[in-house]
Swiss-Prot record:
Official protein name in the record: UPF0053 protein HI_0107
Major localisation: membrane
Record's keyword annotation contains Zinc: no
GO CC terms of this entry: plasma membrane
Signal peptide interval: none
Length: 420
């Protein structure tokens, strides 16, 4: 290199530093890309995104190529800087060149380009992917040879190169949806997606109408009572039973069909009502909502009775109940709304009905009440106290100061709640 002018050496040194910055920035930019947005842009026809996605299909090959050439230009820059230093300062120039080059490379070829690439990953990656794709085709034999040595070394030390495609977990997907929801003006859409994810873990037992609130018709009642129950039915289908739910469930009666028969038949008897009822559809209490939604569709059912492992009726669930878990309460729903079960007080406290669903309370107030052993607010308090409390009893559960206001029928009707 003694015959090469200093000006030429400086130009070559600058080129090496620029190339080092390019490879460093390209590596950071490509590895910082959001793979879901990258896939979306690629499907939209973005050429840079398509090439970047293609490069990232084989990350080992891409990294090998970038590291080979990044090290090559760094070593070249170090050699040239040493020659320049010795020409200018003699033997002391080696130390001077080492110190200056280390600073320059750290700032201009590492920190600066990687910071820019991390902040503008798409712009940097899509631009560099065009160049990297062409260079990789030219130097692929060299990269392939280096990968052979690398894989051989990994086998010697007992490591396996696992390039299997990673599958996103439901919790990771939940995090992605939550982050995307922060940038979405419509809060309902991400909430619906999160509700769909919840259907994997939520069971019919969590959302069912409890047994004591099931609206049904006792065929042993007189006609006036039967007509009154038909007129005030909460759903378009009601449970038809004899004596009680424990004794004999006769079927599920369509309210509209009952009124049609009443108008068309001159002799409308209880036997006619029983024959008009559909066969009862039973649902195990541990059935996930996702599964039950599919079962409703497959069996062409809209309502079912939830039973426990002993076959005892625990509650009732409808197709509408499951859909409301996704989209929220329907305006036409006659089921009690959580808004009606919670009364805000001027002092910041609130009055909560004992029948309020714990999952709904957690959603509304961002609480973390345990829903594993209890489904309602009444059940949570009873589980904590292990007895039916007297009115005026005060307890603390999960950061909530709870005062029992009304007790009746062996359950807590209302309680005052203050967030501590």
């Amino acid at each position: 290199m003694d015959s090469i002018p200093l000006s030429t050496l400086f130009i070559i040194l600058i080129i090496c530093l620029v190339l080092s910055a390019y490879f460093s920035g390209s590596e950071t930019g490509l590895l910082s890309l959001n793979k879901y947005r990258l896939r979306f842009l690629s499907e939209q026809g973005n050429k840079g995104a398509k090439k970047a996605e293609k490069l990232l299909e084989k990350p080992d090959t891409l990294l090998s190529f970038i590291l080979i050439f990044n090290n090559l230009v760094n070593i070249s820059a170090s050699a040239i800087a040493t020659v320049i230093g010795m020409r200018l300062y003699g033997d002391a120039g080696v130390a001077i060149a080492t110190g200056l080059l280390t600073f320059v490379m750290l700032v201009f070829s590492e920190i600066f380009p990687k910071t820019v690439a991390a902040m503008h990953a798409e712009k940097v990656s899509f631009f560099s992917s065009h160049i990297l794709t062409s260079l990789l085709k030219i130097f692929y034999p060299l990269v392939w040879l280096m990968n052979i040595f690398t894989k051989s070394l990994m086998q010697i030390v007992g490591l396996k190169l696992d390039m299997q495609k990673q599958v996103i977990s439901s919790e990771e997907l939940r995090s992605i949806v939550s982050e995307a929801g922060e940038a979405t003006p419509n809060e309902q859409h991400p909430q619906m997606l999160l509700s769909i994810l919840d259907m994997e873990t939520v069971t019919v037992d969590d959302i069912m109408v409890p047994r004591n609130e099931i609206g049904g018709i006792n065929i042993d009642d007189d006609w006036r009572a039967i007509m009154r129950q038909l007129n005030h039915a909460a759903h378009n289908r009601v449970v038809l039973y004899k004596g009680s739910l424990d004794e004999q469930v006769l079927g599920i009666l369509r309210v509209r069909e009952a009124f049609r028969l009443l108008l068309e038949k001159n002799e409308f008897t209880k036997e006619t009502l029983i024959r008009a009822a559909d066969e009862v559809y039973f649902i195990p209490e541990s059935t996930p909502l996702k599964t039950q939604l599919a079962n409703f569709r497959t069996n062409k059912e809209r309502i079912g009775l939830v039973v426990d492992e002993y076959g005892d009726i625990k509650g009732l669930v409808t197709l509408e109940d499951i859909l409301e878990e996704i989209v929220g309460d329907f305006t036409t729903s006659t089921a009690p709304s959580i808004d009606k079960e919670v009364i805000q007080q001027s002092d910041g406290s609130m009055i909560i009905d004992g029948s309020a669903n714990l999952r709904d309370l957690n959603k509304m107030f961002n609480w973390e009440l345990d829903t594993e052993d209890a489904r309602t607010f009444n059940g949570l308090i009873l589980e904590h106290l292990e007895e039916i409390p007297d009115e005026g009893t005060i307890c603390e559960i999960d950061g909530l100061l709870i005062t029992i206001l009304e007790v009746g029928d062996n359950m807590i009707k209302q309680a005052k709640v203050v967030k501590l």
